[in-house]
Amino acid sequence: MEKVTNSAAAKPQGNNKKQESAYNGTAKDKKKPNLDIETTDSDLLSDIHLDGTKEQKVQTLFSKVFEDTGPSTAKTADRKRRLQAEADANNNDTEKASKLAKTSVATTDMDLRVTRKQHTFYMKVQALLAEHAEKESTKKASKMAKISEADLILFMTQKEIEYYMKVKALIAKCAEEGSKLLDNWTSSKDIAKTADHERRLQAEADAKNNDTKKAGQSAKESVATTDMQLNVIKEQMEHCKKVQALLANESKGAEKESKVLDYSTGPSTSSKEAAAAKTADHERRLLAEADVNNNDTEKAGQSAMESVATQGASATERKQSFSLGLEHTSPIQVNGAALACPLVRKSLPPGEANSCPPPPKRDPAAVKSSVKIIKVKAPEEGNNNNDEKEMSTETSETHKTDSVEEGRRVVKWIIFPIKPNFFFKYFWEQTACLVQRTNPKYFQSLISFKMLDEILIRHHLDFTVNLDVTTYKNGKRETLNPEGRALPPAVWGFYSEGCSIRLLNPSAYLTRLREVCTVLQEFFHCKVEANMYLTPPNSQGFAPHYDDIEAFVIQVEGRKRWLLYEPPKEADHLARISSGNYDQEQLGKPIIDEVLSAGDVLYFPRGTVHQAITEEQQHSLHITLSVYQQQAYANLLETLMPMVLKKAVDRSVALRRGLPLHTFQVLGNAYKANDCGSRQLLVENVQKLVTKYLIPSEDDIDEAVDQMAKKFQHEALPPIVLPSEEVRTVHGARSGADEQGNCVCDYKFNEKTSVRLLRANILRLVTEPDGSVRIYHHADNGLDYCKYEPYFMEILPEEAKAVELLISAYPYYLTIDQLPLKSSARKVEVATALWEHGLLMTEKPFK
C-alpha cells in the first residue's frame, strides 16, 4: 500500500476547513475535532491524549515509539487482561470477560506469529498507547483530542506503514481465529486450554467454599499450563511433554523451564541470575493469582507490579545481549539523554551450552574402523630429552644452519616423540595421529588468553577481516560478526555469551608463532597458516566439516573433545576444496573420539570430517597449523596442461584443423549407443592427437613447477632475521655522511667476500613465457596474506647462472669470485644487488 494512498484515504473530504486544519497540523480552531477510530483497530490503537497540535502529538508519539526505550510489555498487558477476565467471571460479568478473553487470545496469537522486528514495532506502539490511555483515564473525554489511525499514517515512513499494515491484518485475522477458538472452548476437551479452564472454575468454586489450599493449588496449575500454551508455537509442540514434566517439579526445574520457554532470536544462553529472576517472577505471579481468588486486591496488585518490574529488567538484559549479535550495533539512550555502550562487560558470567550434542562418549576400543589410529604417549616430564624442550632457533652458528633442516627440527618438536621419517611414512596424508603429553606448558610460548587480550588492545583488528565470532547450536552454525573494530569489551561479551572466537592469522601479531610458521614453510615449501580458536566451557563454535589442508591441532590451554569421521564419499579423501557443514545424521561412527589437553597434538589429513566441543568447566585455546593447501598433482597438471596445449597448438597444424562436419551427429551422450564406424574413427583420432602432441616434456614440467613456486613466493611470510643474522644482512647496515655531505655506507663487497642465500627458498628463478628472466622473492612480503603485489628483480639471462650457483651451493658460502660471470666488477655488482634486496647473507659481519 502506497503512502500517498493511505494519506488520501485518511484525509476527510468536503468543506470542513476546521477538520482539514487538524490534518495540516494547525491550531487555529480551539475546539479539537473528535476523530473516531474503527472498532476493529481498538486493540491496536487506543485513544491517546496529548497536548499540542495534532502534528506535534503524532511526532511526539513516534519519537517515543522508535526510541530504544526497553523491552515490550505485551505479555504484561495480556496477563492483566486475563486477570481482569477472571475477576469479571467471578462477578458474573460474562460479556466483559468474554471480550477480554478474545483480546488476550488475539494478542497471544500475534506474539506467536509475527517476526521479531514486526513484534517489536507493534509492541512499542501498543505499550505507549496503553501508557497514555491509563494516565489520562481519569480526565474528561470531552476536553481531550484523539489521534486516529489516519493521523498516525500521515507521519509514518513507507517502511513503517508496511509494517503497520502487516501487523494490523495479522491481528484482525488472529482476533477472528481467537473468537472461533473461544466459541468452541468448552467443547474441545482434548486440548490443554479446556483443562486450564476447568481448573480455574474449580479454583473459584474452592475459593467460595473457603478451601484456600486447594484453590491455590488449582490456580498454580492453571497459570503453569496457560503460560506454557502462550509461549510455544506449532513447530515446538513436541516439547510440551518435557515442559509439563518440568512444571510438575517447579522448584527444582525452574531454571530448565526458562530455557525451554525462551525462544528469542538472539543468543539463547542466559546467566544464572536471569534464571533466578524468572523463577522469582513466576512465584510472584502465582501469589498474585492466589490473592485474586481470595479477594485480596491490594496485595495482588503489588505482586503484579513486582512481576512487571522483574520482566522489564530481564528483558533489558536479554536485549543488551542480543544487540551484540546484530550486523549493525548502535548506542542506546539512557533516560532519553546520555549514550550508553551496548556492549557486555568482561565480568559477565559464562553462558550455557551452545552446542548440538554430538554422539555420546564411547570406549575407544569399541570404535571399529578401517582407518588405523595411533595414539602416542610422550615420556613423563622428568624423562624429557632435548627434543621435547622448548624450540629455540638462535645458536652461535645460526648463520650456518640449513633452513630446511631447521623446519624439520620444528616438525620434530611438534610431534615428539614420533620421528619425522616415521610420521611421513605412516601418517602423512593417510590417517590421524594423536600425541598426548603430560606437560601442559609445552606450547605456552606460542599464545595465551592474556596474549589475545593484549592483541585486541594494541592492534586494530576488524570483525570478519581479522576475527570471527561463531556459534553452533541446534545443528546450525552462525557467524555473529558485527561491523567495525573488534574491541575487547565486544569480543569478551560474545565469549561470555558462549560464542567461540577465531583469530585469523595471529602470527602477524605474535613473533614466536610467526617464527614457527616461517621455519615450517621452508620445510614444506608452501604457505603455512595459523589460526587461533578460543571456545568457552561447554560450547561448540563450528559444525562438522572437512578442510582442504593438512591440519596440526596444537592444544595450548584447557581441554577439548575431538571427533573425527571418515569422509562420506570416496572422492572426498584428500579433498582439494573444503566442505560445507554436515548434519549429525549424515555422519557415521567417529574413527577417533578423544579429549585433547594442554600440550597435546592432533594431526589429520585433508578431507577428514571433524568437530570439537569443550567440556564443562573447561575452556579451550588451540592453534591449527594449516599446510599443503593446493599442493597436489592435480594442481600441477592444472598449471601444466594449458601450457602444453598452447605450445602444441602453435607447433602442430593437425590440432588447428577443423572438426569433421558430422562430428555433432556421431559424438555426444545422445549417440553413445550408435556404434558406427565414423564414431569410432573420431574417438581414435582424438586419442592419437593427445598421445602425440600433449605429452609434457621435461622443460614443460619445470616451467609449470616454477609457476607454482612463484605463487608460493607471493603467499609466504617474510623471514624472521635473527640477531646473529642481522649483522650479516642489509638489515644491520648503517649509513652516514662525510664532511662534504656524501653518503657513506658501512659495508663494501670485494671478490673475497663470502656470501650465501638467506634461506633455501628465499627466491625463485623463473623464465617467463616472453623470455625474460626474473627473481621472485618474499623478503619484503607483508604479514597479511598477499598484502602486496609479487616482488621480483629482472636480470640478464647470463646472470641467471650466478643465481643458479648460489641456489645449488646452499647452505654453504661462496666467495664472490666463484660466481660464473665474465668480469670481477660484474660479479661484485650482482652480489651487492642481491644483498641489498635482503636475499644474501655474508659469512662475516661488516665492521
Swiss-Prot record:
Cell inner membrane as a keyword of this entry, yes or no, is no
Any one GO CC term of this protein is:
nucleolus
Q: What class of enzyme is it?
A: oxidoreductase
Cofactor dependence is on: Fe(2+)
Q: What's an example GO BP annotation here?
A: negative regulation of DNA-templated transcription
The catalytic activity of this protein is classed by the Enzyme Commission as 1.14.11.-, 1.14.11.27
Phosphothreonine carried by residues: T329
Record's compositionally biased regions (Low complexity): 268-278
Q: Catalyzes what?
A: N(6),N(6)-dimethyl-L-lysyl(36)-[histone H3] + 2 2-oxoglutarate + 2 O2 = L-lysyl(36)-[histone H3] + 2 formaldehyde + 2 succinate + 2 CO2
Recorded hits in PROSITE patterns, A to Z, give: JMJC
Q: How is the cofactor bound?
A: Binds 1 Fe(2+) ion per subunit.
Q: Where in the cell is it found?
A: Nucleus
GO molecular function, one example? histone H3K36 demethylase activity
Which ranges are annotated Basic and acidic residues under compositional bias?
203-214, 279-288, 386-401
- Note the Pfam families from the entry: JmjC_2, RIOX1_C_WH
- UniProt keyword terms in alphabetical order: Chromatin regulator, Dioxygenase, Iron, Metal-binding, Nucleus, Oxidoreductase, Phosphoprotein, Repressor, Transcription, Transcription regulation
The chain positions of domain JmjC read 499-644
**Chain intervals for the UniProt region annotation (Disordered):** 1-45, 203-223, 254-320, 377-401
Q: Where is the composition biased (Polar residues)?
A: 1-24, 304-314
Q: What does this protein do?
A: Oxygenase that can act as both a histone lysine demethylase and a ribosomal histidine hydroxylase. Specifically demethylates 'Lys-4' (H3K4me) and 'Lys-36' (H3K36me) of histone H3, thereby playing a central role in histone code.
Family note: Belongs to the ROX family. NO66 subfamily.
Query: What protein am I looking at?
Result: Bifunctional lysine-specific demethylase and histidyl-hydroxylase NO66
